Amino acid sequence: MELRALTYLDVLQPQVAGFIQTVAQGMMPLDGQAALVVEIAPGIAVNALTDAALKRTRVVPGMQIVERAYGLLELHAFDQGEVRQASAAILERLGVAETERLAPRVLSREIITGVDAHQSAMINRMRHGQMLAAGQTLYTLEVHPAGYAAIAANEAEKRAAISVLELVTLGAVGRLWLGGDEEEIQQAAAAIDAVLAGLAGRPNGGNK
């Protein structure tokens, strides 16, 4: 089994929690809870990680997804200690340290100011979160592995008054769309850069 991503979200922000609720097939997370997001290969191995966490702690699963190549697990609880213990149980099952995850690799990062009304309309058609108004600033991020998009979104919402438009945390890469005033987007972008840079892991030279 390969640990691809493992991130601890200390306090789920309202929009990010709400976004996860739209896709969660398990117990829905609430804002204010702590969460753990884990990406594993092969995907079917996610079942063993869920087993390890649930038998040792009082966390509950929001997502356990097996997709084409990878598995994604989201666990949460109000007790941050329980979530930390779930992380420890998963690492023990894998027989690895947290730093043996892949380090985040940013594949694309863009800030687009003064978005045209036609483009905002197209984005609003595909988004599952908040709306983007014409004239606002758009931030986009593509990160590898995909699981790191969750902590990027949560940190952005924690640090700036932005709208989470779309969040993709599984697949080949993670993707994030944010909208808001230019100054707030700049603050969110800086927060994302800082949190991703602080996640130590194995060298990551590709997007596979």
Describe the role of every protein-language-model region.
Residues 40, 75-79, 143, 177-181:
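Short beta-strand-to-loop capping motifs
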